[in-house]
Amino acid sequence: MNIFNNKLQEIDKGIFEIIKHEKTRQNSVIELIASENFVSPAVLEAQGSVLTNKYAEGYSGKRFYNGCEEVDKAENLAIERAKKLFNCKYANVQPHSGSQANQAVYLALMQPGDTVLGMSLDSGGHLTHGSTANMSGKWFNAVSYSVDKETYLIDYDEVERLAILHKPKLLIAGFSAYPRNLDFAKFREIADKVGAYLMADIAHIAGLVAAGEHQSPIPHAHIVTSTTNKTLRGPRGGLILSNDEEIGKKINSALFPGLQGGPLMHIIAAKAVAFLESLQPEYKSYIKQVIINAKALAGSLQERGYDILTGGTDNHIVLVDLRKDGITGKIAANSLDRAGITCNKNAIPFDKTSPFITSGIRLGTPACTTRGFKEKDFVLVGHLIADILDGLKNSEDNSKAEQKVLSEVTKLIKLFPFYD
């Protein structure tokens, strides 16, 4: 069999059908998972290119393999574009994921047993910020700060108190489910009081930072990590930034050979494409619309009587607290899924429900904003979500509401076609 003469449909009908059906699914639902987005055909083209064939251990100009001239150019482009996008002196585009980026920081700056202070998982933090289920909570002495019990906002006084008490080596500012802006300057002030490194994990808000819609952590944090998907609208991957080039040298060594072997050159090329797209004026307009849409979505749900955590949003995330409604996050997310609206169940701060059940749902606006949704469309989406939630409050069988909403979703989604 000559593999170069066969297309996917001919050689592997199973995978071909899976991809086809997933494409249909993405085209036919209202995608509200806050960590998801739709990349451009240009990003897809780079990611699916012959660069996937090339092994390139090491860094540009210092590879362990020959034949790296072209991939060196690709990586250099990605680095220079990332530095320009975030206005920083150092960028590493090799992390395979945001988690790998965070692990590289741990390896570069900490020793096993050192203390790390990060946001608790139930308050909106990430697994890699010290969760006991994660390496960060197993290898290091993890201490967590939370949010205020009344406002659900970060309590910076508590962060400072815990920092003074525990003297962390690393303080983390970042989240996976928090709808408000972060004060990186305040975090740095706290870090300096105890001699800690400050790491800003901007995986969710990188696009907002790049577009100038959120305070940049670059002037404040010693090190910044991110994913390249989500609001950056690039391929799934990681990114590390800094203005401290000495720390950058430590990060380089930690990532390779410390954590990873060969970088994924096709992904790095796709990152370069996404960074170029993010440097265009249209991208700033896109991010502004993402935030406007999130506020419209939150307001629409509030109008229908649903509790929005913190009373609203400053970014792309809307967290719906369902505790007073007697609905679990799992039941709500599953019912919405059947109605053509995709989101995820999410813990609410101080939630006593199992993380597999939860008391809330997390909604996000980046993906549908990419499709072209505007404020009025998200107002409608909010009402459709409320129709499903209302049905769940009144009956265990929500099929009637699901069918009605699915019909409305189908009409709406046809107005915004994207991948052919």
Curated annotation (Swiss-Prot):
Entry-linked SUPFAM superfamilies: PLP-dependent transferases
A biological-process GO annotation: glycine biosynthetic process from serine
Species name: Rickettsia bellii (strain OSU 85-389)
UniProt keyword Transferase, yes or no: yes
Alphabetical UniProt keywords: Cytoplasm, One-carbon metabolism, Pyridoxal phosphate, Transferase
Biological or metabolic pathway of the protein: One-carbon metabolism; tetrahydrofolate interconversion
Enzyme class: transferase
Obligatory cofactor(s): pyridoxal 5'-phosphate
Recorded family membership: Belongs to the SHMT family.
Gene3D superfamilies for this protein: Aspartate Aminotransferase, domain 1, Type I PLP-dependent aspartate aminotransferase-like (Major domain)
Subunit structure: Homodimer.
N6-(pyridoxal phosphate)lysine PTM positions: 230
Signal peptide: none
Pfam families cross-referenced by the UniProt entry: SHMT
Protein name, entry field: Probable serine hydroxymethyltransferase
GO cellular component: cytosol
EC number(s) per entry: 2.1.2.1
Keyword Transferase tagged: yes
UniProt subcellular location: Cytoplasm
Disulfide bridges in this chain: none
Function: Catalyzes the reversible interconversion of serine and glycine with tetrahydrofolate (THF) serving as the one-carbon carrier. This reaction serves as the major source of one-carbon groups required for the biosynthesis of purines, thymidylate, methionine, and other important biomolecules.
Catalytic activity: (6R)-5,10-methylene-5,6,7,8-tetrahydrofolate + glycine + H2O = (6S)-5,6,7,8-tetrahydrofolate + L-serine
GO molecular-function term, one example from the UniProt record: glycine hydroxymethyltransferase activity
Binding site for (6S)-5,6,7,8-tetrahydrofolate: 121, 125-127, 246, 354-356
